[in-house]
């Protein structure tokens, strides 16, 4: 059996880092971890080929070679996924589809032969059994949550690691919180399910033996969902492994703001090699936080919490949202000031949208305010419901935030604020990579010589070189990120 696995293309967004990737001669940020894991669940004697369309071109010969074409995608990849499905239909190729896009919107995919939905650990074996017996059904679903202690190691040999800036790894699924706009609990539940420490170490080993050295992103919905197990088992095991392997990876992940309440946890994460954590800040407006059921963010000094996490050597990357019912006309300036004061360099600001199945979508349906399905991209200047604030004022205010925070003056001011306060707790092991040396020279030319940010670039360049040389590579990385953010925001604004 010949199996073609296809990962559709991402559009050009803030999260794609397309304009930053060119500096390091990479094609995509992360490999398709879900498909690589699904590949490991298929029979070993099947021939498998994987095409990540963010890194390689999908040609008709690939489709014609396959007995089955497996497609996995998130909502933001829907346009590319639809194109792939149409091509497969035209070539009479049988399609197996799964992942968040198809799970949340299966009613739109009658042109897919087999929909294997929800978590693959549960539904895929049933499909494979039916396929072997010659009685496959169109749709496989489950209301159960998978036991991820049985999840196999990803088949990394199906992709070229050189195409990517970072590898990824999953330790847990689910989140204990229930923000009304978030579909994570719809897809994966509120009780965090975790892998064993043996699984985590085996996955780190697997990546290590591929020869990979550099960033590894833990893609968990909320890495600190189960703090007790993390502190007792997982982080000590990772710390020991990293020391034994001479710190080959730089780790980062996503977590909730209550990380700031646990000094031991922050200290352990820093010692284990974690360097950055993405946190959903959402809004400095207390009423908006209560509205979206984000109690962990309410009733606290958010900037103080961010600064505390950073003092433990963890860079905070932040997500922000505008468009809540309780947002007032001053919210745009308040978010801009908050981002600047906090020193959050990577600040992702999006418009509120209501994904399918969320509490927010259900409320808006009852209120008659839903307009269409969410595209999966909350930074594309579209909103899928009728907001309380005038739509034109909302979009204008949103554009003003982006034009301000991603302008060279404000962006580099924020970088300098962060760099002055930040002290990594763990010495970084330097891994010589010709692409990153090339990125330095490309940044000098594109940002330091011909870019509108050149004055700010050189100020950051020399300040870091002489004051904090240990952060020099991070400073250049931030400058490259700033270029990408500016390009995207200019394209929309």
Language model features with spans:
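Acidic, low-complexity intrinsically disordered segments
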Residues: 1-212
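Residue-level detector of anion-binding/catalytic polar loops
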Residues: 47, 94, 275, 315, ...
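Structural beta-sheet core signal
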Residues: 5, 50, 97, 218, ...
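Flexible glycine/acidic-rich beta-alpha junction loops that bind and position SAM and/or redox cofactors
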Residues: 10-16, 104-107, 226-228, 287-292, ...
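Conserved beta-strand positions
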Residues: 5, 71, 218-220, 279, ...
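Radical SAM [4Fe-4S] cluster-binding motif and immediate context
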Residues: 152-317, 324-337, 365
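Radical SAM enzyme core and accessory elements
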Residues: 2-5, 12, 47-50, 62, ...
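Structural recognition of alpha->loop->beta junctions
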Residues: 107-126, 268-276, 336-349
């Amino acid at each position: 059996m010949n199996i073609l696995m296809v990962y559709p293309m991402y559009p050009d967004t803030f999260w794609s880092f397309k304009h930053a990737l060119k500096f390091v001669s990479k094609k995509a940020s992360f490999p398709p971890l879900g498909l690589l894991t699904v590949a490991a669940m298929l029979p070993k004697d099947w021939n498998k080929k994987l095409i990540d369309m963010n890194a390689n071109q999908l040609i008709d010969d690939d489709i014609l070679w396959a007995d089955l074409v497996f497609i996995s995608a998130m909502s933001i990849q829907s346009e590319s996924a639809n194109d792939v499905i149409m091509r497969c239909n035209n070539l009479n190729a049988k399609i197996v589809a799964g992942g968040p896009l198809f799970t949340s919107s299966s009613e739109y995919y009658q042109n897919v032969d087999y929909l294997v939905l929800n978590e693959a650990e549960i539904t895929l074996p049933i499909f494979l059994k039916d396929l072997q017996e010659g009685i496959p059904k169109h749709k496989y679903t489950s209301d159960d949550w998978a036991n991820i202690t049985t999840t196999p190691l990803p088949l990394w040999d199906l992709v070229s690691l050189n195409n990517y800036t970072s590898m990824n790894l999953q330790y847990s699924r689910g989140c204990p919180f229930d923000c009304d706009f978030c579909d994570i609990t719809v897809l994966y539940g509120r009780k965090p399910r975790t892998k064993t420490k043996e699984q985590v170490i085996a996955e780190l080993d697997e990546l290590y033996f591929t020869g990979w050295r550099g960033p590894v992103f833990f893609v968990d919905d909320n890495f600190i969902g189960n703090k007790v197990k993390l502190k007792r088992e997982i982080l000590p095991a990772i710390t020991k492994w990293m020391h034994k392997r001479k710190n080959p990876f730089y780790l980062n992940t996503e977590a909730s703001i209550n990380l700031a309440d646990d000094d031991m946890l922050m200290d352990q994460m820093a010692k284990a090699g974690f360097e950055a954590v993405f946190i959903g800040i959402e809004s400095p407006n207390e009423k908006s936080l209560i509205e979206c059921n984000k109690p962990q963010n309410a009733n606290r000094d958010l900037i103080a919490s961010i600064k505390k996490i950073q003092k433990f050597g963890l860079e905070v990357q932040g997500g922000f949202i505008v468009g809540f019912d309780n947002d007032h006309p001053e919210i745009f300036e308040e978010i801009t000031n908050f981002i600047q004061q906090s020193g959050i360099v990577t600040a992702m600001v999006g418009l509120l949208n209501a994904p399918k199945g969320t509490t927010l979508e259900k409320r808006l349906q009852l209120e008659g305010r839903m307009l269409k399905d969410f595209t999966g991209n909350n930074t594309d200047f579209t909103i899928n419901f009728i907001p309380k604030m005038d739509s034109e004022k909302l979009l204008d205010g949103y554009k003003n935030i982006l034009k301000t925070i991603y302008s060279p003056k404000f962006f580099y001011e924020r970088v300098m604020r962060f760099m002055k306060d930040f002290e990594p707790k763990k010495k970084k092991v330097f891994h010589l990579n010709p692409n990153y040396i090339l990125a330095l020279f490309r940044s000098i030319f594109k940002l330091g010589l011909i870019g509108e940010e050149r004055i700010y670039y050189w100020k950051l360049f020399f300040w870091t070189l002489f004051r904090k040389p240990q952060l020099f590579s991070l400073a250049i990385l931030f400058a490259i990120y700033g270029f990408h953010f500016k390009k995207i925001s200019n394209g929309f604004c």
